[in-house]
Amino acid sequence: MSQIHSQIHSQANTSQTLATNLLILGAGPAGYTAAIYAARANLSPVLVTGLQPGGQLTITTEVENYPGFATAIQGPWLMEQMAQQAVHTGTRIEYDLITSVDFSHGSPFHLMGDSGTTYKARSVIIATGAQARWLGLPNEKRLQGAGVSACATCDGFFYRGKNVVVVGGGNTAVEEALYLTHHAAHVTVIHRRDKFRAEKVLQERLFNEKKISVRWNTIVEDILSAGAPPVVTGVVLRYFTKNTQHTIATDGVFIAIGHTPTTSLFQGQLELDSEGYIVIPTPRSTQTSVPGIFAAGDVQDKIYRQAVTAAGTGCMASLDAERFLSGL
């Protein structure tokens, strides 16, 4: 058991009410940063971890773009350090999952945990993140961090001079492919349709890039690997028009079919956009459509989606919550 897990409060099979100045939902960079700042402001925050403490960084083997580390660090280790710092500064961490919320009556807000605990919070920071959409292939999860990725900005550096595949046809896929040309020797875009959904200007850039080729009307049926530990060696493709299979060699597979924000719990409670992301009505703020409810990290960010930007908005949300609680 890790050191931080021994300090987490488990509320399994309990029925109690826990009151707090600030309740933070989510245990990724945004949530932990918010907790650290809130604890230092003597707000005595409570952080509810949700199902995946540590967020997406728990499945990221090497992190090279988080400031302060000259060499690559492990994603799970980084999250453990953030959690320890949050606890050290005075955060109470609850290993629980929020299953229902009621923001309709204003502060204090009432939230129910899967454990049976009722949380009563004067303010709330939502940092529940967003999950990359995956293809659902048998080897996909097993090879994450070993050649399979959903973030070119995070992992493109590891494919200098190598061949990679990008799966998808929207803005995300085209942007990922263009970014990867700065590192990879060649990028093959796999798209199940005969045209992209991406913006025209992005398509023009892609078609003018000599290091990119496109395979239309094609899906990935399997991801191949070899070695111990295994690494990606190729993909099995199926062409719709000919109903034939073909295998191509590749060093990396980038899945770029979008992200799903973890916001279903807040439908009807907060303003969400057409993709389910929490709307921040006021620029340069983290305030949601309900006063006293703030959002940080990927749950409100469909553009950057980086650990460092998530941490930054976590800091902002904590400062905004502090001002709200002070009546400023």
What are the language-model segments listed below?
Residues H5, H9-S10, T17, Q131, ...:
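FAD-site-proximal beta/loop scaffold in flavoenzymes
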Residues I93-S115, Y119-F157:
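Glycine/small-residue-rich loop that forms an oxyanion/phosphate-binding "nest" at active or ligand-binding sites
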Residues A19-N21, R160-K162, N217, V290:
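Phosphate-coordination loops involved in phosphoryl transfer and adenosine-cofactor binding
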Residues Q7, Q16, T20-T89, V174-K200, ...:
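Beta1-alpha1 glycine-rich phosphate/pyrophosphate-binding loop at the start
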Residues V174-E176, V290, A296-L328:
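A conserved FAD-binding loop/helix module that cradles the flavin
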Residues G28-P29, Q52, A130-A132, N171-T172, ...:
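Residue-level detector of alpha-helix initiation sites
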